[in-house]
Amino acid sequence: MKWDEIGKNIAKEIEKEILPYFGRKDKSYVVGTSPSGDETEIFDKISEDIALKYLKSLNVNIVSEELGVIDNSSEWTVVIDPIDGSFNFINGIPFFAFCFGVFKNNEPYYGLTYEFLTKSFYEAYKGKGAYLNGRKIKVKDFNPNNIVISYYPSKKIDLEKLRNKVKRVRIFGAFGLEMCYVAKGTLDAVFDVRPKVRAVDIASSYIICKEAGALITDENGDELKFDLNATDRLNIIVANSKEMLDIILDLL
């Protein structure tokens, strides 16, 4: 199967159908609750239905933020977040994406994260590098004098101490897409140790970051392990280097 073609076709159809809802609270409404307890807005449901239209005929396992798990006993599992950054989307904040991760026998195989408003396709096949619209990308070199990170506040970390270690702290509100910003060298790191992140948030960008040279660990600095479901919450650190990772771990 040509997973890149499938993912891009889904992304472009979702884009066509949901962008009229961007920033339009008056047009959106809640249609249900996801397996993890989050409210499902109509644009989430529209996006998921489009993805399912493509995927169900393939008879693969499916994990989706809104639906949960469809187990077809396949060697292939597709993990999707129809809209990464739903809060941003409905509030008119231009930072949200479609996430499409493919696993073979539970191992990362292909990842696609599509940033709608910049029309940016981040993607990677295992062992073949990471790309942004066909251009190869990699994490930037560590520079202690110019560290820019995205961080989700936690009582585990002293924010003032963190600010003394880095030049800029940002919170963008779409973790999977933020991971891609590490992969392309815009951010040095993104991390969340509350824990709040789920597999659906990171499945597509995980392989993109790994192929771009990023380190992805848990709060102890061990390589991140996660199950392919829509409910488990994770602590995750994504860093461009061992030096950056050590700075974050020293704060925990």
Curated annotation (Swiss-Prot):
<comment type="function">
    <text>Phosphatase with broad specificity; it can dephosphorylate fructose 1,6-bisphosphate, both D and L isomers of inositol-1-phosphate (I-1-P), 2'-AMP, pNPP, beta-glycerol phosphate, and alpha-D-glucose-1-phosphate. Cannot hydrolyze glucose-6-phosphate, fructose-6-phosphate, NAD(+) or 5'-AMP. May be involved in the biosynthesis of a unique osmolyte, di-myo-inositol 1,1-phosphate.</text>
</comment>
<dbReference type="GO" id="GO:0046854">
    <property type="term" value="P:phosphatidylinositol phosphate biosynthetic process"/>
</dbReference>
<protein>
    <recommendedName>
        <fullName>Fructose-1,6-bisphosphatase/inositol-1-monophosphatase</fullName>
        <ecNumber>3.1.3.11</ecNumber>
        <ecNumber>3.1.3.25</ecNumber>
    </recommendedName>
</protein>
<dbReference type="GO" id="GO:0007165">
    <property type="term" value="P:signal transduction"/>
</dbReference>
<keyword id="KW-0479">Metal-binding</keyword>
<dbReference type="Pfam" id="PF00459">
    <property type="entry name" value="Inositol_P"/>
</dbReference>
<dbReference type="GO" id="GO:0008934">
    <property type="term" value="F:inositol monophosphate 1-phosphatase activity"/>
</dbReference>
<feature type="binding site">
    <location>
        <position position="175"/>
    </location>
    <ligand>
        <name>substrate</name>
    </ligand>
</feature>
<comment type="similarity">
    <text>Belongs to the inositol monophosphatase superfamily. FBPase class 4 family.</text>
</comment>
<feature type="binding site">
    <location>
        <position position="83"/>
    </location>
    <ligand>
        <name>Mg(2+) 1</name>
    </ligand>
</feature>
<dbReference type="InterPro" id="IPR000760">
    <property type="entry name" value="Inositol_monophosphatase-like"/>
</dbReference>
<comment type="subunit">
    <text>Homodimer.</text>
</comment>
<dbReference type="GO" id="GO:0006020">
    <property type="term" value="P:inositol metabolic process"/>
</dbReference>
<dbReference type="GO" id="GO:0042132">
    <property type="term" value="F:fructose 1,6-bisphosphate 1-phosphatase activity"/>
</dbReference>
<dbReference type="GO" id="GO:0046872">
    <property type="term" value="F:metal ion binding"/>
</dbReference>
<feature type="binding site">
    <location>
        <position position="81"/>
    </location>
    <ligand>
        <name>Mg(2+) 1</name>
    </ligand>
</feature>
<feature type="binding site">
    <location>
        <position position="84"/>
    </location>
    <ligand>
        <name>Mg(2+) 2</name>
    </ligand>
</feature>
<feature type="binding site">
    <location>
        <position position="170"/>
    </location>
    <ligand>
        <name>substrate</name>
    </ligand>
</feature>
<keyword id="KW-0460">Magnesium</keyword>
<keyword id="KW-0119">Carbohydrate metabolism</keyword>
<dbReference type="InterPro" id="IPR020550">
    <property type="entry name" value="Inositol_monophosphatase_CS"/>
</dbReference>
<keyword id="KW-0378">Hydrolase</keyword>
<feature type="binding site">
    <location>
        <begin position="84"/>
        <end position="86"/>
    </location>
    <ligand>
        <name>substrate</name>
    </ligand>
</feature>
<dbReference type="InterPro" id="IPR020583">
    <property type="entry name" value="Inositol_monoP_metal-BS"/>
</dbReference>
<feature type="binding site">
    <location>
        <position position="65"/>
    </location>
    <ligand>
        <name>Mg(2+) 1</name>
    </ligand>
</feature>
<feature type="binding site">
    <location>
        <position position="81"/>
    </location>
    <ligand>
        <name>Mg(2+) 2</name>
    </ligand>
</feature>
<feature type="binding site">
    <location>
        <position position="194"/>
    </location>
    <ligand>
        <name>substrate</name>
    </ligand>
</feature>
<feature type="binding site">
    <location>
        <position position="201"/>
    </location>
    <ligand>
        <name>Mg(2+) 2</name>
    </ligand>
</feature>
